């Protein structure tokens, strides 16, 4: 056992030494890769994801599930094998995109609203791109077609739902319709908003760190001696944004890349997965299956609507903040509503006193 540990330590030291040498020798492309990663974070990831992460945190703390109609609760349970507390989590995950669903599910698990098995199920299937990334960043910017971006969003969303139904059918026998009671904090709305922003900022910074690391690593592959097909495969498997850029002229592959998510996204949710004991192979298998389903749905839609295809080649692609204003506007609107409501509650409380 000691010899095995010694071998691992030696191998780790050698690997770190090689990486260090590569960083020195190829410092210019690595710097450019990190710079590209920062651009992706500032102009693509954070504007589309951060508002939904904040809203998700506020929703699980402030929105009660008590008034969910019984028929919706039953339909949701028999579809996904999940309690009514998970309805808002799944909706937020589908709208916010990865990794918002995993982030919110992890928070609900920590609060005791979801069991480990329920949170695990959500994290495995609620992992897709939101409409902002699919339609605007991928469709409009990369493929020059919002309609194709809509097709990408539809295929990835349907893939998530189908995957969730399959996982629900597998684990439904061990679940019950009765859900744990929601545990709401007694803090004011302004305090809830502050806490939500703080937690979302921390999660966003971790995700951006992973994006910069993978962007730097992929920059090393941009070598003239490496075949373009190898670069495309590496990008598709590793990082979703770069993978979409490389495959923007192949809608079916593009749909698969979106549903796969990339190893970078898988690393981003690793912390959440560890909380509910999700194995790496489970993520790989489920996401690979989701990618196949998404590609098949895209293939069907393109055969029904053959005119909806990207004819433009990607040339000198640069990340542009197409929808950053939407996210900022949403945050400001929610902020104003919360503080107005909180002000009314405070005034009413003071009058009663």
What are these regions (language model features)?
Residues 24-35, 61-65, 136-138, 218-229, ...:
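Transmembrane helix-loop junctions in multi-pass membrane proteins
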Residues 14-29, 34-44, 50-54, 58, ...:
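Selected transmembrane alpha-helices and immediately adjacent juxtamembrane segments
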């Amino acid at each position: 056992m000691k010899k095995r540990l010694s071998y691992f330590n030696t191998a780790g030291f050698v690997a770190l030494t090689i990486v260090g040498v590569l960083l020195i020798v190829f410092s210019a492309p690595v710097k450019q890769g990190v710079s590209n990663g920062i651009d992706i974070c500032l102009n693509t990831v954070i504007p589309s994801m951060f508002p939904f992460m904040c809203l998700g945190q506020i929703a699980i703390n402030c929105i009660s599930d008590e008034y969910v109609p019984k028929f919706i609760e039953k339909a949701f349970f028999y579809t996904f094998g999940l309690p009514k507390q998970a309805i808002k989590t799944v909706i937020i995950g589908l709208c916010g995109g990865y990794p918002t669903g995993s982030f919110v599910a992890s928070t609900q698990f920590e609060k005791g609203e979801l069991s480990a098995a329920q949170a695990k199920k959500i994290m495995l299937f609620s992992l897709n791109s939101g409409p902002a990334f699919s339609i605007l960043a991928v469709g409009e910017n990369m493929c020059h077609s919002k309609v194709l971006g809509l097709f990408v969003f539809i295929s990835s969303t349907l893939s998530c739902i189908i995957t969730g139904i399959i996982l629900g059918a597998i684990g439904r026998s061990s679940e019950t319709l009765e859900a744990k009671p929601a545990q709401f904090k007694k803090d004011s709305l302004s305090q809830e908003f502050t806490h939500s922003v703080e937690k979302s900022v921390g999660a966003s910074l971790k995700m951006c760190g992973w994006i910069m690391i993978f962007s730097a690593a992929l920059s090393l592959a941009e070598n003239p001696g490496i075949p373009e097909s190898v670069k495309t495969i590496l990008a598709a498997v590793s990082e979703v944004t770069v993978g979409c850029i490389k495959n923007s002229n192949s809608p079916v592959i593009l749909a698969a890349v979106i549903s796969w998510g990339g190893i970078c996204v898988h690393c981003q949710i690793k912390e959440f997965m560890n909380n509910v004991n999700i194995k790496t192979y489970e993520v790989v298998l489920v996401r690979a299956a989701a990618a196949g389903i998404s590609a098949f749905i895209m293939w069907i839609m393109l055969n029904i609507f053959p005119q909806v295809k990207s004819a433009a080649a990607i040339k000198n692609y640069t990340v542009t903040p197409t929808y950053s204003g939407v996210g900022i506007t949403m945050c400001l609107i929610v902020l104003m509503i919360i503080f107005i409501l909180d002000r009314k509650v405070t005034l009413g409380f003071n009058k009663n006193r």
